[in-house]
């Protein structure tokens, strides 16, 4: 049986960049000043509370969750977004593999600064 996740562990930013392109970029931008798309721009997400990007229309669920994004909360969210924030409009089913989440978050922490 698989061990329960113990939180974020740094992974490969290169593999994370590929995951972002194939799994996230259709709905999100991450560069500073990037536009909101189907999902909000993710620049500066770490250290910010959920539901805070100006000009993006969030569900009440995202706003009311009021999670402060860090590597661990992002990992938990990306495991199953609809379970972590019931009522979110994020259609993405999540990344079930802990290694994939770690790689993606490692990339995001660099790209979102």
From Swiss-Prot:
Cofactor: heme c
GO biological process, one term: mitochondrial electron transport, cytochrome c to oxygen
Location within or outside the cell: Mitochondrion intermembrane space
InterPro entries named among the record's database cross-references: Cyt_c-like_dom, Cyt_c-like_dom_sf, Cyt_c_1A/1B
Pfam families hit by this protein: Cytochrom_C
Keyword Iron: yes
Predominant place of localization: mitochondrion
Organism superkingdom: Eukaryota
Stated induction or repression of this protein's expression: By low oxygen levels (hypoxia) at the level of transcription. Not expressed until the oxygen concentration is below 0.5 uM O(2).
Additional free-text comment from the UniProt record: Present with 1310 molecules/cell in log phase SD medium.
Family, similarity comment: Belongs to the cytochrome c family.
Protein name, UniProt field: Cytochrome c isoform 2
Species of provenance: Saccharomyces cerevisiae (strain ATCC 204508 / S288c)
Organism taxonomic ancestry: Eukaryota, Fungi, Dikarya, Ascomycota, Saccharomycotina
Gene that specifies this protein: CYC7
């Amino acid at each position: 049986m698989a061990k329960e996740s113990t939180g974020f562990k740094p992974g490969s930013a290169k593999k994370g960049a590929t995951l972002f392109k194939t799994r996230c970029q259709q709905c999100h931008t991450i560069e500073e000043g990037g536009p909101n798309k189907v999902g909000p721009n993710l620049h500066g997400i770490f250290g910010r509370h959920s539901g805070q990007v100006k000009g993006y229309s969030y569900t009440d669920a995202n706003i009311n969750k009021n999670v402060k994004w860090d590597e661990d909360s992002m990992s938990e969210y990306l495991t199953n977004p609809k379970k972590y924030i019931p009522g979110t409009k994020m259609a993405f089913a999540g990344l079930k593999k802990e290694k994939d989440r770690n790689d993606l978050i490692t990339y995001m922490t660099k790209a979102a600064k």
